[in-house]
Amino acid sequence: RALVGVLGEKGRGVFQVTVGPGLTTEVMESLAADNNCPVFQTAALYNDAFPDRAPKMVTDSAEAQARGNQLWAQVSCQPLTMDFALPAAFPMQSLDAWAPLINADNESFERKIRDAEFRHRFRHDLETPQKGKLFFGDWSKVEVAMAVREENREFEGLTVAEMAERQGKDPVDAFFDLSAEEGLETVYTAGLMNSNEDEVEKLMQQPGSLISLSDGGAHLRYLCDAGYGLHLLGHWVRER
């Protein structure tokens, strides 16, 4: 509050923060009201596992505006996607089963992902929705972006679900088997949130939302969404 209070004292500036358990919409609105400044809460991304979260952020922001307070929910016009190989699989790191792998060397890592008990715990985590998780086991949204071995290039461009069906395997087994076979160098692309375009369109059209959310370079190891302006014009304006 002291930080945002400076904006109120100076009568200029905006405040933006990624919200969490301690930063509710009520708190964010009070910051806007107390300092008469625009406040942006991030990020209202549609998540199939928690379908009410993003719409509520947008609706709450619109209601705050109706009360005369400058609160907006930042939304994105494109899916949140990440590229990763297993040793740096950020989408999986929130899973309890993944904890032993975070600082493991490649040899230990590969041995672990081949272990049947590890795969059992991994499946269990995927089937247990909880806040903070990015991936919930929808293998139709994880694609093989780059295979290392020539004999595996046929899988590039396929989702893990499609690859598993072609191999007659469970998707979890297909996912780990390919990476283990390729020395953990296989690169995947995962569509994590905001991939349901019908729901994304609703968020963008609400008065409480602001199409402004992108990642212009803070996490280049995983993603770069800096082209969201062109995606907005090319996909949503021209194509949709």
Walk through the language-model features, giving the residues of each.
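Divalent metal-binding pocket/active-site signature
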Residues: R1-G5, R12-G22
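Polyanionic/metal-chelating signatures
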Residues: L7-G8, L23, E29-S214, H219, ...
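Structural recognition of the beta-strand scaffold that forms the well-ordered cores
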Residues: Q16, I211-S212, H235
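Generic long, charged, amphipathic alpha-helical segments
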Residues: G216, L223-C224, G229, G234-R240
